[in-house]
């Protein structure tokens, strides 16, 4: 009698999904899932009570996925954000490199990393805990005001105690790229990548930045942390998160951007939207709803 086959039934399918945007190949790459306490969101009590009551899951801890995005222009392989790696999530993160390989790429092939901001759930995948560069050939780009803020020892020393880990992780993650001359900053007027426009989206961090790629009349916007919790912040765009460094500006940025996107045919890539985190926005009541892309195995023939 043969031995029973031991199967791992705890894993899901590989975490990558491709779409075509003009001549660009775009792939969402799953890094893992974070626990998100609804109390990290700020809004009127009645609004927050309604949000929590409407959830079809544990109202005390939401699951929020974290993604990175690959853009293959035909000339360059680009990542927009790189997930958390081992810097956040207590072991639930760090799947980016494996999913990148499953999608047919290696870390060595990545030419450019565009960081929407230097929080560890967006740049943690750059660096191992022992200070090794995960993407040895990549040039990393981040807004200068964000880099100056999060990498400043002086700003860190004067920051609230609860914010210290954000500074410590940003500085440790950036260090090997700074040392190698591969950490670059922009002020907003430079051409970092052909066919890509910098989109200032301040509030979450001082210079939180989106990246809009255009190709053959089609567009995709990578909008970073404009949305943390879609089930709360799409119907109620005024709801902010405790991680927003300027909550008034963050709410204003979100309201302005969501209104614009709902009226335009721009594909959106949001790292904390439900996987594959690609879709469009539609106006719904006083807020918005998310229209995700429809799964297809014919990604390059759509």
What is each of the regions a protein language model found here?
Residues 1-15, 296-302:
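Basic/polar N-terminal segments that are highly enriched at the extreme N-terminus
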Residues 12-103, 210-226:
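Conserved beta-strand hairpin/beta-sheet module of binuclear metal-dependent hydrolase folds
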Residues 78-80, 114, 140, 220-222, ...:
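Residue-level marker for buried hydrophobic side chains located in beta-strands
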Residues 94, 216-302:
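Cap/insert and terminal regions of metallo-dependent hydrolase folds
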Residues 101-105, 109, 139-200, 249-256, ...:
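Metallo-beta-lactamase
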Residues 113-123, 201-208, 269-276:
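Histidine-centered catalytic micro-motifs
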